[in-house]
């Protein structure tokens, strides 16, 4: 119950700073899953993510003496915005370390919220590398390190999301699905929800490409991943920490892993149907609904949409990954005879009525009888692939599909 009390105190500290975000019903998803699906809209915070809660609660709880020391943090973007906002509001200077992969939009937002009080340093290719540099710098300067998740005050601040969910539903909820990166949000929300009603099922949703919490819980110890996929940058963490690991092990019922293509599909669906722009990490919880579909029928389910700081310039890439995941986009290396009418035959005899060529380029210009071309084809349905392959064989095309492990494929997708 100590975390419950800490979260109650954090809520008072955050009054007038963090918004009480709405639980938005989704008619589309409720009909799809035969349940009442509510979306906790943390993208509607001033900094467009839940991170303002933990960052402000931590910094505002510093003693007068500690406030005189330099504040240091590391972040993939959203925590940095929360720290910048808090420091500007409290008049405290900060040095913020961010990975070099951080989207420009997030860097600019940090500059906007922090103003002259915040210095940004771009270091490392992942959160973990940036964090190591930040902690070393903090030790040199004898500063206060505001960790994005490995801190009880930060966790308590994030846990106010759980308090708002509980208060808004009077505890009458069957399941809460929370995204997991480092685990600060999940451990805070789960601590409060389980502390008030142990019967509520809490599910963590983590990227399949960076499953640090999943592997740690599976092995019963903190596991550091050798490699991670940083596409879902807001949740790309190589190693969780002891505090969040302990709380998640105690209060989170299980963790499901989501492939990036599934997350991209959720992002596209949210934009097309609800007009919601979310970042990849923000879509994790909603992406997990298929994994729990059978057990949530006729129940109330809350999915935490944790943030909306997404650069719209990423949407072409997001759509590409979604189409590949759905089996609707495929790439081939095709050898065409260098004679008139060969491409016309391919279009007329191989492509179906709803198949589209979305990319075509000769890999190498040649005077030989045959030339290889890279061809991208978009299908209306994944079931259209087999008929396409059969028609290509019938006209005796020499072709091969590009596999996901190939370097050229990774360049395209």
Give the location of each predicted region.
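PLP-dependent amino-acid enzyme catalytic core
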Residues: 1-413
């Amino acid at each position: 119950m100590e975390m419950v009390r800490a979260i109650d105190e954090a809520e008072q500290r955050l009054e007038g700073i963090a918004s009480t975000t709405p639980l938005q019903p989704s008619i589309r998803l409720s009909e799809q899953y035969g349940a009442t699906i509510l979306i906790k809209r943390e993208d509607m915070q001033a900094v467009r993510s839940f991170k303002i809660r933990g960052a402000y609660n931590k910094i505002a709880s510093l003693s007068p003496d500690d406030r005189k020391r330099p504040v240091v943090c590391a972040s993939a973007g959203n925590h940095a915005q929360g720290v910048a906002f808090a420091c500007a509001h409290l008049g405290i200077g900060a040095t913020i370390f961010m990975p070099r992969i951080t989207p420009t939009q997030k860097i600019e937002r940090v500059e906007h919220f922090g103003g002259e009080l915040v210095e940004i340093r771009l270091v490392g290719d992942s959160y973990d590398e940036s964090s190591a540099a930040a902690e070393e710098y903090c030790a040199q300067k004898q500063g206060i390190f505001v960790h994005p998740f490995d801190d009880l005050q930060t966790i308590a601040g994030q846990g106010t999301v759980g308090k708002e969910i509980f208060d808004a539903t009077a505890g009458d909820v069957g399941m809460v699905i929370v995204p997991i990166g480092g685990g600060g949000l999940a451990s805070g929300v789960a601590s409060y929800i389980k502390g008030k009603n142990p019967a509520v099922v809490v599910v963590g949703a983590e990227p399949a490409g960076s499953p640090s919490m999943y592997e740690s819980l599976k092995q019963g110890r903190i596991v550091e991943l050798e490699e991670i996929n940083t596409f879902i940058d807001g949740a790309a963490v190589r190693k969780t920490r002891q505090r969040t690991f302990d709380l998640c092990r105690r209060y989170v019922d299980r963790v499901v892993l989501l492939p990036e293509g599934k997350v991209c599909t959720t992002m596209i669906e949210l934009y097309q149907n609800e007009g919601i722009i979310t970042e990849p990490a923000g879509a994790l919880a909603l992406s997990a609904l298929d994994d729990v579909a059978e057990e949530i029928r006729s129940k109330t389910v809350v999915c935490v949409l944790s943030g909306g700081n997404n650069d719209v310039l990423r949407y072409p890439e997001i759509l590409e990954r979604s189409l590949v995941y759905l089996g609707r986009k495929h790439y081939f290396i095709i050898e065409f005879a260098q004679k008139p009418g060969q491409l016309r035959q391919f279009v007329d005899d191989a492509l179906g009525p709803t198949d589209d060529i979305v990319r075509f380029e000769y890999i190498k210009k040649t005077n030989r009888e045959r030339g290889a071309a890279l061809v991208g084809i978009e299908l209306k349905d994944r079931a259209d692939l087999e008929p396409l392959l059969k028609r290509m064989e019938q006209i005796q095309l020499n072709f091969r599909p590009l596999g996901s492990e190939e370097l050229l494929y990774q360049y395209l997708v």
